[in-house]
Swiss-Prot record:
This is DNA topoisomerase 1. GO terms for molecular function: DNA binding; DNA topoisomerase type I (single strand cut, ATP-independent) activity; metal ion binding. Residues 2-126 form the Toprim domain. Its cofactor is Mg(2+). The lineage of its organism: Bacteria, Bacillati, Cyanobacteriota, Cyanophyceae, Synechococcales. CDD domains: TOP1Ac, TOPRIM_TopoIA_TopoI. It comes from Synechocystis sp. (strain ATCC 27184 / PCC 6803 / Kazusa).
Amino acid sequence: MSKLVIVESPTKARTIRNYLPQDYRVEASMGHVRDLPASAEEVPAAYKDKSWANLGVNVEDHFSPLYVIPKSKKKVVKELQTALKNADEVILATDEDREGESISWHLLQLLQPKVPIKRMVFHEITQEAIRSALENCRDIDENLVHAQETRRILDRLVGYTLSPLLWKKIAWGLSAGRVQSVAVRLIVQRERARRAFKTAGYWDLKAELEQNKNPFQAKLMTLGGTKLANGSDFDPNTGALLPDKQVVVLDEAQAIALKERLTGKPWAVVNTEEKPGVRKPSPPFTTSTLQQEANRKLGISARDTMRVAQKLYEEGYITYMRTDSVHLSDQAVTAARNCVQQMYGKEYLSPQPKQYTTKSKGAQEAHEAIRPAGTEFRIPNQTGLKDRELALYELIWKRTVACQMADARITQLSVLLKVEDAEFRAAGKRIDFPGYFRAYVEGSDDPDAALENQEVILPPLKVGDRPNCREIDTVGHETQPPARYTEASLVKTLESEGVGRPSTYASIIGTIIDRGYVQMRSKALTPTFTAFAVVSLLESHFPDLVDTGFTSRMEQKLDEIAIGKTQWLPYLQGFFLGESGLENQVKVRQDQIDPAIAKAIELENLAAKVKIGKFGPYIEIPQGEEIITASIPQDLTPADLNPEQVAVLLKQKTEGPDKVGIHPETGEPIFILIGAYGPYVQLGEATEENKKPKRTSLPKGVKPEDVTLEMAVGLLALPRNLGEHPESGKNIKASLGRFGPYVVHDQGKDGKDYRSLKGDDDVLTITLERALELLAEPKRGRGSRTPLKQLGLHPEDQEPVNLFKGPYGVYIKHGKVNASLPEGETEETITLEKALPLLAEKAGSGKKTSRKKATTTAKGTKKTTSKKASATGTAKKTTTKRTTRKKAASPDQSSEAG
């Protein structure tokens, strides 16, 4: 007999296995083993006629959730049940947060072990931590389970109640979510502010001066004793000067005249000032600050940051990555201070060990901050990590070490200079002692380079000095609208407002991008027309559900449930039932919402009407007695739609496409058109005989008005054959694809090898030599998988059989068939002969068409002890007809659970 330890993932299982005695068997649940039904297909036959069946929550019987085992988890559950037969003790070692507690609880309810059960928790996977956790097991925390379950039910109630309303009133397949919709509204509000923003222009002067051959710069501050205007002096809604501002506003002509008046006049230093100051290091990372800094420094999305951090945690490199605590254990503080002393010297160590306190709204679970694992921190270049894993680990290491370093000491320098009636100011900064800057500068990837950039050197100057003015320049400025949210700034705002939980931000941002509410534009989150329509409807009819304050108070209630301060059932009843509950609100407003109004979007500074149609957004404008409509290209957002763009779309609709010229070889006309996916060139007209003329999209950044005949001919000739690869003898071509221009090497049976073009590369002019350089570079991104090992060719089709490393461990791949390595096999021991039967078994199992019923448990409201299964929920028998369309996006916002 053995002791069965259950964790979430195979990677975590492999790492933990190294630290446990021989008689411990570690298995993975692969995440949650039960959940609410994801679709009508998963609802068991016994419940399909219930009015609440599609909701998956029996609101008539104490909000009893209907839990099912997803089809993808049935094999896992069966394997765990088999492993349980040989166990004399079960240890549930899932993560130490609400989701982890919930997974353990579900495993307990599902497996119903007859042997002793323990709950083991840890926040890092090291030998010391695992052994300590093993000696300090506890029971399942029912309050944490209630909090997770309440959050899950809330997300389902909001998603499944509001989403169908959006389908009826705006467009099929839309979704609403408890946190998702608030995030979308923030992004839409920012875009509205940008559209309403009125730009104001103003000018100032910049002087290049010299003292004892040492150059420095100064900026005009006052004229005739009155302060010069800057951007903060203007009203963002009108562009006019704010009424209480007593400032001088220069236009271009006045700035030029002032420059000419001051040129050649003597300058004098009238005041100097030095202000000493300190810069303190930032606290170690929480989930949200890690996401923000990884996005700023490394350009990694919140979703990818969490994926990489999860891997680092499961492999024992960092502590648990879902936390809002900035606290460090005494051992961690000691480890960080040892690193400082060894690498930078004692003078860079803070005089006393530093501890930090969490200031974010609603901070909860008592984890540590994210830091390198263990009592001795591994130096990044000695970990053996590569690529993103190394970059993220190094970021965490630097931040943790820096938090125990001495403050940086700086001096702010200010020199006031006068010429005629104008006063200029030269500002400088001197770093007297770099302190923690030596290891970490927030927002910078290179501390040494950042250190140089931090300093602004001024020559020694004193009152009465007369520096030489070498040049005066006029500088024009325009006030800027508020910046669009990036992933980093949205995460920061969500956390500061107390909306959602840091552990859910990555999935929320991923969801709003995947659902088409937001597009990424140069790291900025740009809302789509659909986002505007949905937010307008929710603001008008369900304002609480998109209000940050209301959503923040919901989070506080969930936190209170987690510590037993608030009862979960009364809270759910108050939210959903009764006259003011969500269920009744939706019923009442369903008849009040006019689809024609819901589909219309009002945009600042735009006379044309924008509407959401069956095939996407379009513009509508009256022209005499007619109403002209024109589709809006899919990649065009409200940010891009202005009166000029509207005129272009309407002109194309009424007058037909612009003609670039005649193709020199075919004699056919070449047109430029704008379609649902943006502008493209077309060879010839679409006729009955030629229904699909040759078309090619314009490369990103190329405007329709900039297209020449030569460029159009080149685009229509794509793909270009560049020549043969010197090693394979196969063709290399250049072309345009969904993700932009690329080159491709056709390797025959080995598939096609793609590389994106870079920088100044032009798909129309790239040479074979340059293509070979690109192909020689290692692949990047999602499709860049290089086999760990090539096992050989499959005897049936001579296609390669390879080993790859995926998120759940090493697997075998042949064509489209993937097979996991069986227990006991490793990358070194697996052979082609062993792989073939595994692939055959996997391929055979994929051909089965019989479908088993979903295993279900309808959970009641009473929970006795953690070892007992929950009661089966019952409900009054009613029949509700529902139409299910497979293509609709699921309204469930399970990704928001956290």
